[in-house]
C-alpha cells in the first residue's frame, strides 16, 4: 500500500540525507580529511557526548500514519519497496489490531516511523538474517522528532526491532570505533557504520538537523 504524498502535509517528508562529518579530499583521493569538518555546528559539538546507533545496510523505509490509515513508502516518493518487504510491513503494521494501536498511540496525529528494510535480497543483508524485516531508527510526529525513549516505546508497542545504541561518546571516539571494522550486533554481518545524534535534539543556524554518520568503508 503506497501513499501519494503530493499535497500531503510536509511532515510526511523524506528522511534527511545524513552527511559524513568531514570534507573529502579534492585532489583525487576522495578520502575523508579527518578534522576538517563540513558543518561548523558538528565541529563545535565534536567533544560533546553523542548517541551512536548502528547503521544498518538496507533500504530506507517510511511507515506513515495519516491519522486514519497506515501506508508505506521508500526513502523518496518514487522509490519502490521490494514485494517481500511490503508483505512484512503489512504483517507488522497492517490489520485491525495494529490500526487500533496506531489510534491508541497517536490518535489523529500525523506520524512517520522511519526504519530500514533489511535482510535477504536487500543490499548485502543476507548476513543480517535469512528473511526480510523492518528495524526502526527514528520517528516524527507532526513535524517533531521523538526522543530515543519514545522511539523504544513505539517499537515495544508494535513488537518491532529498534536499532541498537552502540555507545555514547565523541565524534573522534566514533571514528576510532569504525576503524576497527567491528561486527554488526545483528546476525553475522560486518557493521556498516554508526549514526550519531547529540543527546538532545539540535539544529544548526540554517534550521538543519544535526546528525551525522561514520561508515567503516570511509576509514579503510
Model-predicted segments: where are they?
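Core nucleotide-handling region used for phosphoryl-transfer chemistry
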Residues: 6-220
Amino acid at each position: 500500500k503506497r501513499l501519494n504524498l503530493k499535497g500531503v502535509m510536509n511532515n510526511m517528508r523524506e528522511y534527511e540525507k545524513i552527511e559524513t562529518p568531514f570534507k573529502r579530499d579534492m585532489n583525487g583521493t576522495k578520502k575523508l580529511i579527518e578534522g576538517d569538518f563540513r558543518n561548523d555546528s558538528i565541529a563545535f559539538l565534536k567533544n560533546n557526548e553523542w548517541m551512536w546507533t548502528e547503521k544498518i545496510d538496507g533500504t530506507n523505509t517510511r511507515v506513515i500514519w495519516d491519522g486514519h490509515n497506515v501506508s508505506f513508502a521508500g526513502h523518496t516518493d518514487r522509490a519502490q519497496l521490494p514485494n517481500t518487504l511490503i508483505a512484512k510491513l503489512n504483517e507488522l503494521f497492517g490489520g485491525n489490531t495494529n490500526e487500533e494501536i496506531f489510534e491508541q498511540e497517536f490518535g489523529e496525529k500525523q506520524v512517520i516511523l522511519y526504519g530500514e528494510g533489511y535482510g535477504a535480497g536487500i543490499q548485502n543483508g543476507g548476513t543480517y538474517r535469512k528473511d526480510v524485516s523492518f528495524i526502526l531508527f527514528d520517528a516524527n510526529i507532526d513535524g517533531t522528532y521523538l526522543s530515543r525513549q519514545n522511539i523504544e516505546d513505539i517499537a515495544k508497542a508494535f513488537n518491532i526491532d529498534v536499532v541498537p545504541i552502540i555507545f555514547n561518546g565523541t565524534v573522534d571516539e566514533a571514528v576510532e570505533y569504525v576503524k576497527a571494522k567491528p561486527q554488526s550486533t545483528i546476525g553475522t554481518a560486518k557493521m556498516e557504520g554508526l549514526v550519531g545524534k547529540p543527546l538532545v535534539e539540535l539544529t544548526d543556524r540554517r534550521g538543519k538537523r544535526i546528525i551525522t554518520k561514520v561508515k567503516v568503508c570511509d576509514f579503510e
